[in-house]
From Swiss-Prot:
Cell surface receptor which may be involved in carbohydrate-mediated communication between cells in the germinal center. Binds glycans with terminal alpha-linked mannose or fucose residues. GO terms for molecular function: D-mannose binding; fucose binding; identical protein binding; metal ion binding; pattern recognition receptor activity. Residues 86-101 have a biased composition (Pro residues). SUPFAM superfamilies: C-type lectin-like (SSF56436). This is C-type lectin domain family 17, member A. Ca(2+) binds at E341, N343, E348, N360, D361. It holds the Pfam family Lectin_C. The keyword Chloroplast does not apply. Phosphorylated on tyrosine residues. Expressed on dividing B-cells of germinal centers in various tissues, including lymph nodes, tonsils, stomach, intestine, appendix and spleen. The chain crosses the membrane at residues 173-193. Residues 1-119 are annotated as: Disordered. The gene is CLEC17A.
Length: 378
């Protein structure tokens, strides 16, 4: 009866409201009018599933929509099914109040396929099924969250992303390089300064060493020079004495204070000196310490001094111990040594003549009188 009234356009008889509410075959009935609220879980799903082929599949970890688990399992042939009517006009003469929305069932069936019914007397609009879209829609689905908007937990909001972190590391690296260069330059500068100080100290030490060597060489050279001067002077005086003796002079005379004997002059000193000082005095006066070559000469000298004084002779063994020689280098041919002399006690290397004309060895550094000998001058 409900269908008859619906076809003829008459209002529903009383009692049909409860029958419609109790109609368990609600999902197989004619789609509701536009002024009725959609069935929970069906209209929005159809609107969202219009672009099902072009939509991006949801994340695997997203929970399923309420009441759609069994629909996804049952709607395997959703792409080949006919979409339901969406723009059906309301029934003529129907003034029934809008139905309250029913609670969503746990198990819902897919919507009816797009199939026209033989309804006479109704002004139904033409229903067109949209062709399936084969193109891929690149626009993100409204239910699918955007990848750009997904927050990443390991990135800090203040860091500004990986680019900002990379810039920060670049800044740290630049600061490290600049610091390393500065420390390297500072170390090089300190090393150069220390090197210059060490080189300056080395030059000063080299200069001091050179000065010390020069002084030592100068002192040694000065001592050698003095020795050479003394030797040259002695040789010169000896040459002059010999030259004067060779000259043919008419009158042979001796200097004042000198005693002549067989063409020679002898000087007996009134003061005392060491052996070296006495030798130097004789050389300065163109003479030498007395050299005895004969008994007559020895007797003249022993008698001439006539006093208990001890005089230096020109005899010594400095070159070799025990080898006594005169100043002219000749060995001793006549010996007038006292008994047990020479004994070389206390480094006694020079010879003296005592009061009786005997010889004795004495240290060259002691002081006593001396006798000089030279040839007579004309």
């Amino acid at each position: 009866m409900h269908n008859l009234y619906s076809i003829t356009g008459y209002p529903d008889p009383p009692g049909t409201m409860e029958e419609e509410e109790e109609d368990d075959d609600y999902e197989n009935s004619t789609p509701p009018y536009k002024d009725l609220p959609p069935k929970p879980g069906t209209m929005e799903e159809e609107e969202e599933d219009d672009d099902y082929e072009n939509s991006t599949p949801p994340y695997k970890d997203l929970p399923p929509k309420p009441g759609t688990m069994e629909e996804e399992e049952e709607d395997d042939d959703y792409e080949n099914s006919t979409p339901p009517y969406k723009d059906l006009p309301p029934k003529p003469g129907s003034s029934a109040p809008p139905r309250p929305p029913r609670a969503a069932k746990e198990t819902e069936k897919p919507p009816l396929p797009c199939k026209p019914r033989n309804m006479t007397g109704l002004d139904l609009a033409a229903v067109t099924c949209p062709p399936p879209q084969l193109a891929v829609n690149l626009e993100p689905s409204p239910l699918q969250p955007s990848l750009a908007a997904t927050p990443v937990p390991w990135l800090n909001q203040r860091s500004g992303g990986p680019g900002c972190c990379q810039k920060r590391w670049m800044v740290y690296l630049c600061l490290l390089v600049v610091t390393s260069l500065f420390l390297g330059c500072l170390g090089l500068t300190v090393t150069l300064i220390k090197y210059q100080e060490l080189m300056e100290e080395l030059r000063m030490l080299s200069f001091q060493q050179m000065t010390w060597r020069t002084n030592m060489t100068g002192m040694a050279g000065l001592a050698g020079l003095k020795h050479d001067i003394a030797r040259v002077r002695a040789d010169t005086n000896q040459s002059l004495v010999e030259l004067w003796g060779l000259l043919d002079c008419r009158r042979i005379t001796c200097p004042e204070g000198w005693l002549p004997f067989e063409g020679k002059c002898y000087y007996f000193s009134p003061s005392t000196k060491s052996w070296d000082e006495a030798r130097m005095f004789c050389q300065e006066n163109y003479s030498h310490l007395v050299i005895i070559n004969s008994f007559a000469e020895h007797n003249f000298v022993a008698k001439a001094h006539g006093s208990p004084r001890v005089y230096w002779l020109g005899l010594n063994d400095r070159a070799q111990e025990g080898d006594w020689r005169w100043l002219d280098g000749s060995p001793v041919t006549l010996s007038f040594w006292e008994p047990e002399e020479p004994n070389n006690i206390h480094d006694e290397d020079c010879a003296t003549m005592n009061k009786g004309g005997t010889w004795n060895d004495l240290s060259c550094y002691k002081t006593t009188y001396w006798i000089c000998e030279r040839k007579c001058s004309c």
